[in-house]
Amino acid sequence: MVEKGKMVKISYDGYVDGKLFDTTNEELAKKEGIYNPAMIYGPVAIFAGEGQVLPGLDEAILEMDVGEEREVVLPPEKAFGKRDPSKIKLIPLSEFTKRGIKPIKGLTITIDGIPGKIVSINSGRVLVDFNHELAGKEVKYRIKIEEVVDDKKNIVKEIVKMYVPRLSDVKVTIRNGTVKIELPEFAPFIPNIQTAKMAIANEILKRLEDAEKVSFVETFERKKETKEENK
């Protein structure tokens, strides 16, 4: 069985009321009409049993072997939680005006970092539900443990992808306690990259016992001039 804290790569399909709402399978997403071009599909890496997936999935993963596929049905408390009436708030319309938001029924908004859905607008007040949209729902997952990641360089690469999915193929070297990560030229233009680099470094130092230092290398090469440019 998978040990707690081990990095594993998993694939999964999530269903609610018989409809697919989440998947790592690009073709299935397209077939079922939930494809998101901004998503990067394929197996994802997590640290087993550490709360990086739904509680019920975490429990199932710790009971599974590599290569095993399982179907699990999760009650609300082990999925997206029970519906909490206290998370349904009446907010003055003036608050939305102040924030430059035009409230529309059904619109998903974020207030103070918390996402919510507008339920109704009446008499200068807006009813917003801050429960997760799947709160109170039973969900079903098909999950497969694709592999356990043991190689240190691959662990580092997967940690980088966890925080910045666009950095899917960085070069990693590990020598004398230093983990060196070579970033592509476009890396400095990724939003919040400095914060992500700090989080990546902290995660690596936490996971690799013999790592003492993490360095990020950004290399910019001289562009070769074409014959057209030299004319």
From Swiss-Prot:
Region entry CTD, spans: 151-231
GO MF annotation, one: peptidyl-prolyl cis-trans isomerase activity
Domain PPIase FKBP-type: residue ranges: 5-92
GO cellular component terms, A-Z: cytosol
Organism, scientific name: Methanocaldococcus jannaschii (strain ATCC 43067 / DSM 2661 / JAL-1 / JCM 10045 / NBRC 100440) (Methanococcus jannaschii)
Membership in a protein family: Belongs to the FKBP-type PPIase family.
InterPro entries in the record: FKBP26_C (IPR040825), FKBP26_IF (IPR054016), PPIase_dom_sf (IPR046357), PPIase_FKBP_dom (IPR001179), SlpA/SlyD-like_ins_sf (IPR048261)
PANTHER family documented for this protein: FKBP-TYPE PEPTIDYL-PROLYL CIS-TRANS ISOMERASE SLYD, LONG-TYPE PEPTIDYL-PROLYL CIS-TRANS ISOMERASE
Region (IF): 83-134
Quaternary structure note: Homodimer.
EC number(s) per entry: 5.2.1.8
The record's note on its domains: Contains an N-terminal PPIase domain, an IF (Insert in the Flap) domain and a C-terminal domain (CTD). The CTD mediates dimerization. Chaperone activity requires both the IF domain and the CTD.
Purpose of the protein: Catalyzes the cis-trans isomerization of peptidyl prolyl bonds and accelerates protein folding. Also exhibits chaperone-like activity.
Intrachain S-S bonds: none
Protein name: Long-type peptidyl-prolyl cis-trans isomerase
Catalytic activity entry: [protein]-peptidylproline (omega=180) = [protein]-peptidylproline (omega=0)
Keywords: Chaperone, Isomerase, Rotamase
One of the GO biological process terms: protein refolding
